[in-house]
């Protein structure tokens, strides 16, 4: 078994969509970044990569590389999913939290879970997504950005093998 922890944050700005978990959320602001700035999917990818000591998303998808400009983070998640499978691992579960003062995200969480589960080819029952606020504190509380945290558990599929 391997455990990974991921974290991501992006600044909120105007004239850009708000995409979380691959869901386009109606809001007057969006997240600014090189890709689609989906902090939830970015945190999940960092957790998965970290569990296998494979670096982070900046290593695999450098912001200096224009082929990742405005790319859907779900496409990047598909790459990470294939990478962990190629190493002989499968996902036990993923637990994530989005930290945002607004908008209210509860209505969109089922679609986020479904999008992530489809890409990872797992049941939605092992994908947890929650949303919380910071009660007006910090940059998320001041509505300057959105953050996400994720933790994952990976299982080694290879019988009688030594963990990485």
From Swiss-Prot:
Subunit (UniProt): Homotrimer.
Matches recorded under NCBIfam families: ispF
Protein name per UniProt: 2-C-methyl-D-erythritol 2,4-cyclodiphosphate synthase
Pathway membership, UniProt: Isoprenoid biosynthesis; isopentenyl diphosphate biosynthesis via DXP pathway; isopentenyl diphosphate from 1-deoxy-D-xylulose 5-phosphate: step 4/6
Free-text comment on the cofactor: Binds 1 divalent metal cation per subunit.
The keyword Cytoplasm appears for this protein: no
Entry binding sites for a divalent metal cation: 8, 10, 42
GO MF annotation list: 2-C-methyl-D-erythritol 2,4-cyclodiphosphate synthase activity; metal ion binding
UniProt keyword Lyase, yes or no: yes
Catalytic class of the enzyme: lyase
Cofactor annotation: a divalent metal cation
Family matches, as Pfam families: YgbB
Site (Transition state stabilizer): 34, 133
Gene Ontology annotations of biological process type: isopentenyl diphosphate biosynthetic process, methylerythritol 4-phosphate pathway; terpenoid biosynthetic process
Residues that, per the record, bind 4-CDP-2-C-methyl-D-erythritol 2-phosphate: 8-10, 34-35, 56-58, 132-135, 139, 142
Annotated Gene3D superfamilies: 2-C-methyl-D-erythritol 2,4-cyclodiphosphate synthase
Enzyme Commission number(s) from the entry: 4.6.1.12
Catalytically driven reaction(s): 4-CDP-2-C-methyl-D-erythritol 2-phosphate = 2-C-methyl-D-erythritol 2,4-cyclic diphosphate + CMP
């Amino acid at each position: 078994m391997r455990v990974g922890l991921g974290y991501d944050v992006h600044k909120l700005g105007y004239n850009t969509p708000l995409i979380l978990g691959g869901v386009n959320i109606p809001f007057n602001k969006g997240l600014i970044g090189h890709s689609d700035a989906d902090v939830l999917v970015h945190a999940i990818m960092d957790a998965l990569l970290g569990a296998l000591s494979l670096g982070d998303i900046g290593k695999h998808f450098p912001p200096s590389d224009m082929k990742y400009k405005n790319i859907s983070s779900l496409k990047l998640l598909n790459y990470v999913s294939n990478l962990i499978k190629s190493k002989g691992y499968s996902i036990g579960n993923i637990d994530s939290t989005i930290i945002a003062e607004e908008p209210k995200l509860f209505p969109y969480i089922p679609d986020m879970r479904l999008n992530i589960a489809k890409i990872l080819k797992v049941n939605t029952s092992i994908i947890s997504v929650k949303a919380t606020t910071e009660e007006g504190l910090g940059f998320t509380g001041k509505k300057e950005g959105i953050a996400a945290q994720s933790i994952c558990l990976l299982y080694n599929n290879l019988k009688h093998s030594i963990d990485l």
